[in-house]
């Protein structure tokens, strides 16, 4: 089996972790899911936001460990920055097939409402201003850069019961 890296992306509240939990083991045969939010919840279960920086560092260390071992893995991100672009190029040069699955929401207000619902159910909060910034940046970065950097990408509408494919593409 070839080495693969799967990036589950989208705005806060888009359902990335929920999607990953069913998609990765069942559809993608990728049981290794590296998630900073889940790491933070393990470090500080009653206040995961206090462990966010440490969790982010641990996530990057775990990614590096997988790369050293030549293992396949998946991780999630909002794509609000350009930090993964250089890494994606390097991963592809190392023989990894890199796929990106982006879960869309119609607007930042929907993302804010979903995060508020997650908090009501005991999940972690994200400040409204951060959600708005990441929402705009993530979609812009997908369209301008990330979908051209990976081997394959798919964009889903994640408003309904299950994500609906909107568009997809492949690169050489």
Give short role names for the model-derived ranges:
Residues 7-10:
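The Walker A (P-loop) glycine that initiates the GxxxxGKT/S ATP-binding motif of P-loop NTPases
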Residues 54-105, 138:
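Glycine-rich phosphate-binding loop used to anchor ATP phosphates in small-molecule kinases
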Residues 16:
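Conserved lysine of the Walker
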Residues 144-172:
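NTP-dependent small-molecule kinase module
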Residues 20-71:
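Conserved substrate/cofactor phosphate-moiety recognition/catalytic segment
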Residues 13:
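Walker A (P-loop) phosphate-binding loop of P-loop NTPases
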Residues 96-142:
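A glycine- and Lys/Arg-enriched "phosphate-lid" helix/loop adjacent to the NTP-binding pocket
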Residues 1-5:
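Extreme N-terminal starter segment of soluble prokaryotic enzymes
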């Amino acid at each position: 089996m070839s080495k693969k890296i799967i990036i589950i992306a989208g705005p806060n509240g888009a359902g990335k972790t929920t999607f990953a939990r069913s998609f990765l083991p069942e559809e993608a045969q990728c049981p290794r899911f590296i998630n900073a939010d889940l790491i933070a919840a393990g470090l500080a279960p009653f206040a995961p936001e206090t462990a966010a920086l440490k969790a982010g560092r641990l996530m990057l260390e775990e990614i590096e460990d997988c790369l050293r071992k030549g293992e396949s893995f998946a991780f999630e991100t909002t794509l609000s920055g350009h930090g993964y672009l250089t890494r994606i190029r390097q991963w592809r040069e190392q023989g990894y097939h890199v796929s990106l699955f982006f879960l869309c929401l119609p607007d930042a207000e929907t993302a804010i409402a979903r995060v508020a619902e997650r908090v009501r159910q005991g999940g972690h909060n994200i400040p409204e201003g951060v959600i708005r910034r990441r929402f705009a940046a993530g979609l812009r970065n997908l369209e301008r850069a990330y979908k051209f950097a990976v081997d394959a990408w798919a964009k889903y509408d994640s408003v309904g019961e299950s994500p609906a494919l909107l568009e997809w593409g492949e690169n050489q």
